């Protein structure tokens, strides 16, 4: 098994991003790749400035497939619908099976959210999160939220004190 991580132009430029955001994301990817490698995983890492960078996720996967004999490609369910729609075509484009696995980094699955949203006239995420917190026990003390407040939106709307500079 190999793990492919790729910094690609398509993902960095599909909408205008602040340069510092792109630097943060690429830095996080590089640190994650190193951690995986240090843990013994076989990592293929494609930097944005690599001479042979293919420019898109699909093209990087195609290139990796041309360099190695993979039986299938396994990806994590992406956080963006446009990426999901692209990945759903990869099996046809690559000629090998593509498995899209659930992303367990979220508090709920897409199915759980769909079930919650069905029949509701208004989707207020705060109420969904309350249900998920009760279900999972996250940030809960018994059946009450930690600190007896469901959210701190009012506190988050306050201006940063003048004597504090952001990092």
Q: What spans do the regions from the language model cover?
A:
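N-terminal beta-strand-loop-alpha-helix module at the start
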Residues: 1-48
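Short strand-loop junctions, especially beta-strand C-caps/beta-turns
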Residues: 48-49, 78
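Beta-rich, aromatic/charged-enriched effector core domains that present basic-aromatic interfaces
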Residues: 56-167
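Catalytic cores of large soluble enzymes that bind and process phosphate-bearing ligands
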Residues: 21-24, 28, 53, 79, ...
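Flexible, glycine-rich phosphate/dinucleotide-binding loops
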Residues: 12, 52, 107
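Acidic-and-aromatic substrate-binding clefts and catalytic sites of carbohydrate-active enzymes
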Residues: 49-55
């Amino acid at each position: 098994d190999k793990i492919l991580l790729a910094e690609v132009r398509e993902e960095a430029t599909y909408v205008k991003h602040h340069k510092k955001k792109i630097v943060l994301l690429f830095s996080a990817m590089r640190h994650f790749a190193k951690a995986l490698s240090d843990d013994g995983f076989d990592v293929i890492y494609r930097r944005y400035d690599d001479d042979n960078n293919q420019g898109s996720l699909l093209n990087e996967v195609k290139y990796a497939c041309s360099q190695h004999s993979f039986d299938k490609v396994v990806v994590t369910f992406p956080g963006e619908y446009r990426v999901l729609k692209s990945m759903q075509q990869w099996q046809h484009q690559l000629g090998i099976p593509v498995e899209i696995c659930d992303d367990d980094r979220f508090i709920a699955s897409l199915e759980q959210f769909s079930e919650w949203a069905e029949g509701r006239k208004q989707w207020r995420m705060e109420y969904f999160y309350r249900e998920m917190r009760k279900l999972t026990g996250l940030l809960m003390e018994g059946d009450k939220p930690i600190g007896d407040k469901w959210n701190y939106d009012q506190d988050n709307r306050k201006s940063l004190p003048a004597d504090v500079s952001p990092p």
